[in-house]
Design a protein with these regions (language model features):
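Flexible mid-to-C-terminal extensions adjoining Fe-S/redox cofactors in radical SAM and related proteins
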Residues: 6, 11, 405-462
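Long, charge-rich, low-complexity alpha-helical segments
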Residues: 59-151
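Short, charged low-complexity linear segments at domain edges
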Residues: 129-151, 371-379, 418-437
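A sequence-level detector of short linear motifs
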Residues: 57-58, 242, 408
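Short cysteine clusters
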Residues: 160, 167, 171-174, 391-394, ...
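Acidic, low-complexity/disordered tracts enriched in E/D and polar residues
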Residues: 1-80
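Radical SAM enzyme [4Fe-4S]-AdoMet core and its adjacent flexible, acidic
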Residues: 2-4, 10, 33-36, 255, ...
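Conserved alpha-helical substructure of the radical SAM core
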Residues: 102, 113-116, 120, 124-252, ...
Length: 462
């Protein structure tokens, strides 16, 4: 179905690029909204609202126009505290804008829609039931309308520098170790700043700073500060998260930090990280929490750290409420025999997760399992997970290698995996290249498998 002339005109003037607004930026209920246009607007093709870089919601054309009108009305108040009277004026302006596009709709109805939309957004980001039904976003069906992924992982730190190992630990399961594109020469500060602007121009709303170990770069705070338009996350081993660095990252508007914590047992953690850094990691988590950053932990699960419930209990005691866990990504260090020997069977992995999920529910924690294909959908749902992981390569996420090479995902670092260079190649050519389209088409099947290969032991194992 086609749009009206008024709708088409408004969308052309106000929604031809990604729009962004942050509500209550200094408060506990901060809400960051990115409104993403589709390639070609149609009445039956939704726009997309990305909330805090996590919740992906389809919006009708009318609600997208209403939200864009609100964003326009909020622009003069960017970075300022908004009084109740000012907010009433902002809402009235948004309603007036939408009413000009939809003159046959009563302003009271538009005002009610605006309130329902914002109330639903806040409920979803708080993990609550929204007052109106929200249709889940089917990325597989929506893939052909996308012009860019929703997240780009920037591998700002290389695994090697000047011919030597360039990480402060050597994790047994490191996906970037022994991979050609994980060890290329790093871009300098100005080049990474240019990459960040390229991502914004492409309409990518979320950036993750990762590596290698991104905290080994002296310019990390500057890069994060330059990315304030995006929802930003830092993936780190946490060892260099001093109090001062955490405060600087918070001041630079970093949205969240994910720290790899292998185990509550110091000896096991150090064995898996290949360095005696347990105390540093715990200190880093505490510093990040104290600085007010949104902190989560990530734990790749194997036969050596099966007491995952104890790891969650430790995280809980440190003030962390969010956790992700996974099997072993079958690439890099996880393809070596020592790592393969620790892979868990589906039965063993299920036995690890069941008590962990019970602990999380009892202690108001949230866990996401992120490895496609490791466990059947029915098992994950029975365990209590609300989402079944699926491959997002060239669909929901992509990555930029240390030298600017664009990759299907941050683990896809093997030779000849590059899809172009973000500094030298136009984005539309990278996104629409045959190799990128092939990977995206596989991801869009939503078959809950990892395109990098088999991850689960065929038989036997632990």
């Amino acid at each position: 179905m086609f749009l009206s002339r008024a709708e088409s005109s408004y969308l052309h003037q106000h929604l031809s690029v990604v729009r962004h607004v942050t509500l209550d930026p200094e408060g506990p209920g901060v809400l960051r909204i990115h409104l993403l246009p589709c390639k070609k607007a149609r009445r039956n093709v939704p726009f997309v609202a990305l909330l805090n870089g996590q919740d992906i919601l389809p919006l009708s054309v009318s609600w997208a126009i209403l939200l864009a009108g609100l964003m326009d009305a909020l622009q003069p108040f960017e970075g300022k505290e908004i009084t109740e009277d000012q907010w009433a004026g902002i809402a009235a302006q948004a309603v007036e804008t939408a009413a000009a596009v939809y003159p046959k709709t009563a302003p009271d109805q538009i005002r009610a829609d605006l309130n329902a939309m914002l109330t639903s957004f806040r409920a979803l980001t708080a993990g609550q039931e929204p007052p109106v039904h929200v249709q889940p976003m089917d990325l597989g069906a929506y893939a052909r309308y996308m012009a860019a992924p929703h997240r780009m992982d920037l591998m700002v730190s290389s695994m090697e520098k000047d011919g030597a190992w360039h990480c402060n630990q050597k994790c047994l399961h490191c996906y970037a170790a022994n991979q050609p594109l994980g060890a290329v020469k790093e871009l300098d500060t100005d080049q990474w700043l240019a990459v960040i602007q390229k991502c914004r121009a492409a309409g990518i709303p979320q950036l993750t700073f990762t590596g290698g170990e991104p905290t080994m770069r002296n310019d990390l705070v500057s890069l994060v500060h330059a990315a304030q338009w995006f929802v930003t996350r830092l993936n780190t081993n946490g060892r260099m998260l001093t109090s001062a660095l955490c405060r600087e990252l918070a001041d630079a508007s970093l949205d969240s930090v994910q720290v790899t914590l292998y185990s509550a047992d110091e000896a096991i953690h150090n064995t898996l990280m290949g360095a005696p850094g347990y105390a540093d990691t715990i200190s880093g988590i505490l510093n990040a929490v104290e600085a007010g950053l949104n902190v989560s932990i990530n734990t790749p699960l194997c036969s050596l750290n099966q007491d995952y419930t104890a790891t969650l209990a430790l995280a809980n005691s440190l003030g962390v409420r969010y956790a992700t866990c996974s099997g072993l990504i079958p690439t890099g260090g996880a393809e070596t025999d020592p790592s393969k020997a620790t892979r868990l069977t589906p039965e063993a992995l299920t036995a690890v997760l069941r008590p962990a999920m019970a602990y999380a529910e009892q202690n108001h924690m949230e866990i996401n399992f992120t490895s496609p294909g490791w466990l059947p959908d029915a098992v994950l749902l029975d365990l209590g997970f609300t989402q079944v992981p699926s491959c997002g390569a060239c669909l929901s996420n992509m990555a930029v290698a240390p030298d600017g090479t664009v990759l299907p995902c941050q683990s896809w670092l093997r030779e000849n995996a590059g899809l172009g260079n973000i500094l030298h190649d136009p984005w539309h050519k990278i996104w629409n290249a045959p190799a990128c389209r092939r990977v995206r088409e596989e991801s869009a099947k939503m078959e809950h498998i990892c395109q990098l290969g088999t991850t689960v032991p065929a038989q036997g194992g632990l």
